[in-house]
């Protein structure tokens, strides 16, 4: 598991350096095997089962494509993109004035996973799509997997 997380981190950071040989076309290069299928991955968090990663995939305003949050199972190497967040919440953790979910323009950048004082898991995601905000989500276990429930947002102060 640790090796897969390390390898995924190297793949995600692959564009940050200038290696002598690059993996292209999603083909292995020597002992390096890329994990393909992500779209502009930005950040990741290891979830409580120590096998699932939550990964932010930033959209592209240049091409009009939204981003997403995705789950990556490190054992089966499967990617599950979470649905767009269009449903309002029945409970708000962010600013009282933020009651509209990010919708289909959602484009997450950095993410953070933490446990709230009440014991529930919280995911914060910096959003650059549709609005500049920090979106609040509750991480929920569902069967043998996970899902996120939108719980509000924090918006920048207007000057």
Predicted regions and their residues:
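Blade-loop segments of beta-propeller domains
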Residues: 68-115
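Short loop/turn segments immediately following beta-strands, especially the blade-tip
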Residues: 138-146
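Beta-strand-rich domains and repeat architectures in extracellular enzymes and scaffolds
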Residues: 33-68
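Residue-level detector of Asp-centered blade-edge/turn motifs that repeat once per structural unit
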Residues: 47-49, 115-119
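Surface loop/turn motifs at the tips and blade-to-blade linkers of beta-strand repeat domains
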Residues: 34-37, 83-85, 101-103, 152-158
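Beta-rich catalytic cores
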Residues: 40, 65, 107, 130, ...
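A short helix->beta-strand "capping" segment at the edge of beta-propeller domains
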Residues: 18-40, 93, 148
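C-terminal motif of bacterial Sec signal peptides marking the signal peptidase cleavage site
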Residues: 14-15
């Amino acid at each position: 598991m640790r090796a897969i997380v390390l390898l995924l981190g190297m793949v995600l950071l692959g564009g940050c350096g200038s290696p002598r040989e690059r993996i292209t076309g999603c083909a292995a290069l020597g002992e390096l095997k890329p994990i393909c299928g992500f779209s502009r991955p930005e950040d990741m968090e290891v979830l409580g089962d120590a096998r699932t990663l939550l990964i932010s995939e930033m959209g592209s305003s240049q091409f009009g494509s939204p981003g997403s949050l995705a789950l990556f199972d490190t054992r089966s190497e499967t990617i599950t993109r979470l649905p767009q967040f269009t449903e309002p919440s029945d409970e708000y953790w962010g600013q009282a004035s933020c009651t509209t979910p990010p919708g289909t323009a959602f484009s997450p950048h950095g993410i953070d996973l933490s446990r709230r004082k009440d014991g529930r898991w919280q995911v914060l995601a910096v959003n650059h799509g549709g609005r500049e905000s920090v979106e609040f989500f509750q991480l929920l276990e569902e069967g043998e997997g996970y899902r996120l429930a939108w719980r509000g947002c924090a918006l920048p102060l207007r000057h």
